[in-house]
């Protein structure tokens, strides 16, 4: 909540919350859709490489506090690309924070790019094409967002192509049932 509020101010992005406390109360979600609502509102304040660095670094500090020595993080470029944020901006900000984590805390990491289930497979293929430029930084691809009406079979050919490109695959599943 604190970082979301800070980045909204820094980037002059209006959010529907007047304080950190209001954001914190919005985090009392009861189902996947209410979680996704606050998640996407938070995503909207991420604009610059520095923002992605700051978000990743905050996560790394929590990892350090919890004595985590390896982490595999997911990111959703499709949440940002339509707003004009470049794939390079996203991946460089995340990667620089993860490199700093390795250098300063010896926390190792891997990056997994996720496709958004509620979007069509064609838009996911476009993002996969971008991801191929960063195979040195992205270990795998995944699937997340709303499951209702978006079964994994919808993305069968996408995942086949990702595997052909050398990516490992994973998917969030079960948050909303069959």
Predicted regions span which residues?
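Metal-cofactor-binding active-site regions of metalloenzymes
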Residues: 1-167, 176-178
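Active-site metal-binding loops of divalent metal-dependent hydrolases
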Residues: 173
């Amino acid at each position: 909540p604190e970082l979301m509020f800070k980045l909204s101010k820094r980037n002059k992005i209006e959010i529907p919350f007047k304080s950190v406390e209001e954001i914190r109360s919005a985090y009392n979600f009861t189902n996947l859709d209410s979680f996704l609502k606050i998640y996407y509102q938070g995503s909207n304040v991420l604009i610059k490489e520095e923002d992605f660095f700051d978000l990743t670094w905050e996560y790394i500090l929590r990892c350090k506090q919890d004595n985590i020595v390896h982490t595999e993080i997911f990111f959703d470029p499709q949440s940002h690309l339509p707003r004009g944020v470049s794939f390079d901006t996203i991946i460089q900000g995340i990667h620089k924070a993860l490199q700093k984590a390795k250098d300063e805390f010896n926390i190792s990491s891997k990056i997994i790019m996720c496709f958004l289930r509620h979007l069509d497979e064609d838009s996911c293929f476009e993002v996969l094409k971008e991801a191929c430029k960063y195979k040195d930084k992205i270990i795998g691809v995944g699937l997340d967002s709303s499951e209702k009406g978006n079964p994994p079979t919808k993305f069968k050919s996408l995942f086949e192509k990702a595997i052909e490109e050398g990516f490992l695959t994973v998917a969030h599943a079960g948050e909303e049932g069959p």
